[in-house]
């Protein structure tokens, strides 16, 4: 929320740095050097690097040194202020092996969102996916929210089966995006229930018959609202 932050961070600008742009080219080392030098001249700037573990093991042109090493001096002197994001697995596999790099950071564990929070995330992400794909989930917000709840509830089974590696909201977002992809491959400009069915089925954690049964229950529960929208209820193939 606005102003809901520590006073020490107020007034800072945050810039997201694309990890592939740093390590996916032959001049990644030069880009990092230019970035570090630029940060020395600026006050109250924080850079954010997602998938920061990818810098570990990405060699510089001078040898096997990780590109991550190029940030160490700036981090130690305070001229570089950096927030990095990664998963617990990647943190333990890559980041922890470089103790000097670890000492320059404070680890903050982000708790997995609840199912209710996950539904909110899906609802906020929907408009972006619609713009990106040109496909619409063409229902009222009430039905959209309940479709998101349905996806979250169904992916809870996926979470149970693959508990170690699967987390909210990623698994639910993946299913939502796959529903839009299924619509695109179906040459449809709108996401239908059959596309949601295909997306959930692709997880291979829920039997197709179970998905069909739950979709039938969903449609029955909201049949009046769907009828008002003129929705033609089709059976998944």
Q: Whereabouts are the PLM-identified features?
A:
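AAA+ P-loop NTPase nucleotide-binding core of proteostasis motors
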Residues: 1-237
């Amino acid at each position: 929320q606005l102003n809901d932050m520590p006073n020490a961070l107020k007034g800072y600008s945050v810039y997201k740095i694309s990890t592939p742009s740093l390590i996916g080219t032959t001049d990644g080392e030069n880009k990092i050097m230019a970035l570090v030098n630029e940060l020395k001249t600026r006050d109250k700037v924080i850079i954010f690097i997602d998938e920061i573990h990818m810098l570990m093991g990405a060699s510089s042109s001078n040898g096997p040194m990780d590109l991550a090493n190029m940030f160490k001096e700036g981090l130690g002197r305070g001229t570089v202020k950096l927030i990095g994001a990664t998963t617990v697995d990647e943190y333990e596999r890559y980041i922890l092996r470089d103790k000097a790099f670890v000492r320059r950071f404070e680890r903050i564990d982000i708790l997995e969102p609840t199912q209710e929070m996950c539904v909110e995330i899906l609802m906020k992400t929907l408009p972006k996916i619609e713009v990106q794909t040109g496909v619409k989930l063409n229902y009222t917000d009430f039905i959209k929210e309940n479709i998101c709840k349905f996806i979250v509830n169904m992916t809870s089974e996926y979470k149970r089966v693959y508990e170690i590696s699967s987390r909210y909201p990623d698994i639910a977002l993946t299913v939502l995006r796959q529903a839009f992809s299924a619509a695109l491959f179906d040459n449809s400009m709108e996401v239908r229930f059959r596309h949601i069915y295909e997306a959930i089925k692709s997880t291979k954690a829920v039997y197709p018959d179970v998905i069909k049964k739950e979709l039938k229950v969903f449609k029955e529960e909201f049949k009046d609202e769907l009828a008002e929208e003129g929705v033609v209820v089709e059976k998944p193939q």
